[in-house]
Amino acid sequence: MSKTYHFIGIKGAGMSALALLLHQMGHKVQGSDVEKYYFTQRGLEQAGITILPFSEDNISPDMELIAGNAFREDNNSEVAYAMRHQLPFKRYHEFLGEFMKQFTSLGVAGAHGKTSTTGLLSHVLKHMTATSYLIGDGTGHGAADARYFVFESDEYERHFMPYHPEYSIITNIDFDHPDYFTGLDDVFNAFNDYAKQVKKALFVYGEDEELRKISSPAPIYYYGFEDTNDFVAFDITRTTNGSDFKVKHKGHAIGQFHVPAYGRHNILNATAVIANLFIAGFDMKLVAEHLKSFSGVKRRFTEKVINDTIIIDDFAHHPTEIIATLDAARQKYPNKEIIAIFQPHTFTRTIALLDDFAHALNEADSVYLAPIYGSAREVDKGDVKVEDLAARVERPAKVISVDNVSPLLDHDNAVYVFMGAGDIQLYERSFEELLANLTKNNQ
């Protein structure tokens, strides 16, 4: 039976994906959000899903309400209205925990690599059997006859605790979200609690010291490059066309694989997917075939060429992610200068990881920094500025503004890697406009 869903904060990555999924399952879906453009809204608009400004008038008692986690009674008129009139609503993660019970569910958790791995697992599985999925880049798909459900499992504020998947991958554990987690031990405890809720099998990166401590009532399979793991990637060849490798399980090769993706981390992501699908009983020849056609996810090493200039857009906003992204750029473009344009995301993360950010950015040949993008949850107390990061980077590092990105033109034979979780795409757009204008002026 069709329902009407109203999403409070529909432009959020998870919310927009869930809205698309429910829409494709035949439900009526609408939502509200701020006017500012987010990359997630294009998919919503293409699907014909109405996006409204926040207003009490959007809500009626016959709707099922799903509210984004950032929206509360004191900062959102719709949440306040629902509470005042005792209209029930669920948070995204609460709704998802109930929704997935009707499927064989496969979760992907981890400090880094969740979205890429969820995208890869969804891509391969949907080509073998009817599958619904939610990806953290705002992509959602609802198959009417789906038996399987693939989803991204987010650790922030322990949002993954309502989830009890049959299978789950955990890519890694790292200290992030210092506005919530008190330290690495706190992060570990959250993931360990989640692991205890997995029912059939857990797949974890075996060379992560923290993950080796994880416990679960479900069997734990370790994957990685070392022979101490249950699933081992070996005979690895990294080229400008992607990565080729074999995987063995208990000493026996189970297949040869190619992923059209770059960087050591993407070999690990693919190995996790292979391990999960092997244990779930899928044909490895089919898995290998469908891995070859994976085209990536939004804002994860997304490439374009403007005026013969290569531009890469990536969501990397943690030192570990920056290193992985720059490693991928070097693999694909070994003979080009790698230029990093990075915008730190949140003051708390920048303060907590300042030296780690500097170390990560040293992997580029030159570095340009945008002013710190503060979260809506925090206030700039002046404790840290982007110039503090620039001073710590050993490579040439300059601070740029969105109104003047012309210093980026000082490089020949370069690849420009824009990274960040704030509004770094505004800087990218400014650079693209600058390149386009140069083309016009030269004609």
Curated annotation (Swiss-Prot):
Pathway: Cell wall biogenesis; peptidoglycan biosynthesis
Chain's role: Cell wall formation.
One GO BP annotation of this record: cell wall organization
Catalysed reaction equations from the record: UDP-N-acetyl-alpha-D-muramate + L-alanine + ATP = UDP-N-acetyl-alpha-D-muramoyl-L-alanine + ADP + phosphate + H(+)
UniProt GO molecular function: ATP binding; UDP-N-acetylmuramate-L-alanine ligase activity
UniProt EC number: 6.3.2.8
Record-linked InterPro entries: Mur-like_cat_sf, Mur_ligase_C, Mur_ligase_C_dom_sf, Mur_ligase_cen, Mur_ligase_N, MurCDEF_pg_biosynth, UDP-N-AcMur_Ala_ligase_MurC
Protein name per the record: UDP-N-acetylmuramate--L-alanine ligase
Leader sequence segment: none
Gene name, Swiss-Prot/TrEMBL: murC
Natural source organism: Streptococcus equi subsp. zooepidemicus (strain MGCS10565)
Family in the record: Belongs to the MurCDEF family.
Binding sites annotated in the UniProt record for ATP: 110-116
